[in-house]
């Protein structure tokens, strides 16, 4: 099974590389940028593509919540994190790069599931708002229902933590950039169930649920 997927991924990367190479001559004809610049950009794009498929392949056995014993956690993975339903709002939210779109759609589903009454304003607001049109976006909140923070933002995390209760959910974005920091958040006595999606982590604070750290293929 693994060799097949490796071959499949390699073929996709080769196809992507050839497609981008085919565009270089057209770009070169229309612009004054050196060919070498576009070649370097193409190489990096293909490398990023390969990395995405490698991450996906390394977590393939963590897909769709299989093996999760808790019905609540399984349902969250299956019907929120990896929900495949083609929401009508997705078409209206298109236009961003692949990672912004991938995370944005997840945030849409989180807002749709959590239905927060109030959230902090951020660059993903249109995704949150599409998921829950009743949400009010403000600069400061008194209680966390659903929030997002970058893994590097230590002060932001502490500020949110002081406003959390058992129903709070925090998305920690970019955990792949600082695994040490993410593992500390997983082990923190203030946190409960956590979900590692590689591109972001989701933290619950419900102490009535058994503390568990899940790695999910997202």
Where do the PLM segments sit?
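Activation on terminal intrinsically disordered regulatory regions flanking enzyme cores
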Residues: 1-2, 21
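Extreme N-terminal basic, low-complexity initiation segments
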Residues: 2-9
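A short alpha-helical cap/connector motif
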Residues: 14, 22, 26-28, 33-166, ...
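Structural detector of well-ordered beta-strand residues that form the stable sheet scaffold
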Residues: 169-171
């Amino acid at each position: 099974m693994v060799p097949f997927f490796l071959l499949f991924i390699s073929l996709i990367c080769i196809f992507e590389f050839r497609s981008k190479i085919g565009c270089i001559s057209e770009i070169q004809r229309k612009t004054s940028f050196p060919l070498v610049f576009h070649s370097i950009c193409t190489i990096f794009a293909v490398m990023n593509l390969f990395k995405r498929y490698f991450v996906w392949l390394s977590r393939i056995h963590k897909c769709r919540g299989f093996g999760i014993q808790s019905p609540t956690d399984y349902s969250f993975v299956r019907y929120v994190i990896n929900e495949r339903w083609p929401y009508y709002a997705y078409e209206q939210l298109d236009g961003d790069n692949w990672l912004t779109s991938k995370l944005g759609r997840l945030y849409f589903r989180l807002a749709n599931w959590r239905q927060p009454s109030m959230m902090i304003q951020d660059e993903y607001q249109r995704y949150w708002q599409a998921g829950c049109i009743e949400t009010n976006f403000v600069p400061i909140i008194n209680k966390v229902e659903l929030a997002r923070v970058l893994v590097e933002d230590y002060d932001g995390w502490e500020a949110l933590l002081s406003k959390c209760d058992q129903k709070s959910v925090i998305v920690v974005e970019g955990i792949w950039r600082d695994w040490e920091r993410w593992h500390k958040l997983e082990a923190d006595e203030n946190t409960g169930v956590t979900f590692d999606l590689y591109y972001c982590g989701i933290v619950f604070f419900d102490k009535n649920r058994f503390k568990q750290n899940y790695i999910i293929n997202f």
